[in-house]
Amino acid sequence: MRTRLLVLNLQGLLQENRWREFLPELPQARQRRVLSCRKEEDAARLTGVGLLLRRALMDAGIPAENQIFSENEWGKPYLPGGPEFSLSHAGAFAVCALDAFPVGADVETARITGAVAERFFHPDEVSFLQTLPVFEQADARLRLWTAKEAYTKYLGGGLHVPFSSFCVRLTENGASLELPENVPFLHEYRLGGCRLCLCSRGERPELEFVSIK
């Protein structure tokens, strides 16, 4: 199967708390997570990624009643015998990546400070940031963060994998991992005011914008 990268604008779910209308379509475990959210926007984001995953898996021939998930040793959900997937949400967007092979996706709007970079990034990344003009550093830190998140999700460990244990290289042509092998690849996107990065073994997929009615 080809890599898919689905995007949902959450504004519709945020209007008059419409996310509640779609809650019954989600698995019980995700419903509980949604209802535990203190903020309506967080509930809408969790609902949005759940709906995206449900849609993507149904498109892949897996009916909703067969979408029964397990968790790996780090707590990452997966579908036994099914395709690999990765979920992320930030700002007004929810993202779902789907692939036959491991995949990781991350979308971010947060400002990554210099202090955070020095604490968590690889020394070579910190040195690279210091060579940039000050006005370019904030976006470069965000690019690095999304790339590193995407790679750790690809590995299946998420934040259990130390960000300082591997290095991401940024150029005008994109981002890449400094690894002995040639894969996986990093694919970067701009999404409104967000930065989005996909980590996969395949070619760069086009964004697929999805509407939930």
Region spans (language model):
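Core catalytic alpha/beta fold that binds nucleotide/phospho-ligands
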Residues: 1-213
